Amino acid sequence: VACRRNGAWADAALKAQLGKCALSAQDAALCSRIVYGVMQNELLLNWYLSAYCTQKLDHLQPPLSDILRIGAYQILFLDKVPDHAAVSESVELCRTNGRSAASGLVNAVLRKVAQNKSNLPPLPEGNIARLSVAYSHPQWLVKRLVSLLGIEEAEAFLRIDNEASPISVQVNPLKTNEKALVDELRGEGVCVTPHPWVPGCLELSGTGDLTTLSAFYNGRFTVQDAAG
């Protein structure tokens, strides 16, 4: 909401909010994944939600459209979050944001998304419209990319551009070893992948605020790219 209303940078707004909420590292990681996931897939989420919502998303009172996107993202992209939990948490968000009257709408729309997630509406016809929705990029940019690269290369570019970039960190061998650090980070809900060719380098995603991780606080790793 801060990004949409005030033009705030996602990283800064999320870090500030996580600092206020005092979440566990695991919950902060989940929160971060949801925030970035919703922003990266906004047009795709809008497309699916519009199929089950009787009102246009941009006509809903804020922050209802974002609550719907948050719920739909969890249902469609997060296997570890049960559908019923995503629905109930979204309904609760309506209440905590002073939109209790809309809780029935949110409940109904998200239940339909969950019921149909194996048979979702087809993407729009036409290469430009399809790619725009599938990868949540504006049509003007998709047109430009297709004219420069062709359909196949443009789609590959859009796919990569829409993936979250991992954070590269280096294990501090004076305080831990790679296996122990991997186990510790995964225990806190962080997605960890050892770098394919650089020893002691790990690629992290879904970290939330890095500074809340015990391993960061205790100096068991440093943020540094693989080339460093």
Question: Where on the chain are the PLM-derived regions?
Answer:
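Class I Rossmann-like S-adenosyl-L-methionine
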Residues: 1-216
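Conserved SAM-binding loop and adjacent beta-strand
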Residues: 217-228
